Amino acid sequence: MKHTYFYDTLQWTAEGTYYAEEEKSFPLHGEVSILHSETEWSLTGFLEVRFTGEPVRFTNDYVIKDTDKQNTLSWESFNPALGTLKGTFEIVGDSIISFYQSEDGVYMGTETLTQAAEKKYYNAGVSFCRGQKMSSWTAIITADDQGR
């Protein structure tokens, strides 16, 4: 099965659980749009976590580019809370594995998307601040057929 995340222009929705540093869990909801141009791809999205009351929204805008390495994509994103993040997406079988770090080296993390079906991925990730676990999450990400 070929990967559809990144490679197809689709709208994606995520539903799952966000874990704060003390492992307290909260529901999460996210949406992602992926667009392609001749030189790069863009991934724009948000993640909402319902800690208490109104959800807190985290936004990210990624620029994704091919590299000279097979099965490796580079990316850069600006996150209002963390600053500029740079990383790679490594395509490994049915999984897409990402490692990232902030420009100042304070924040880093990893995330894995494992393809379950053509338009469905399982997602798990963890982020760190100065080497200490900051948060983690699990989610199911599905494509919206209306996004085509």
What are these regions (language model features)?
Residues 1-3, 147-148:
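Short, Lys/Arg-enriched, disordered terminal segments
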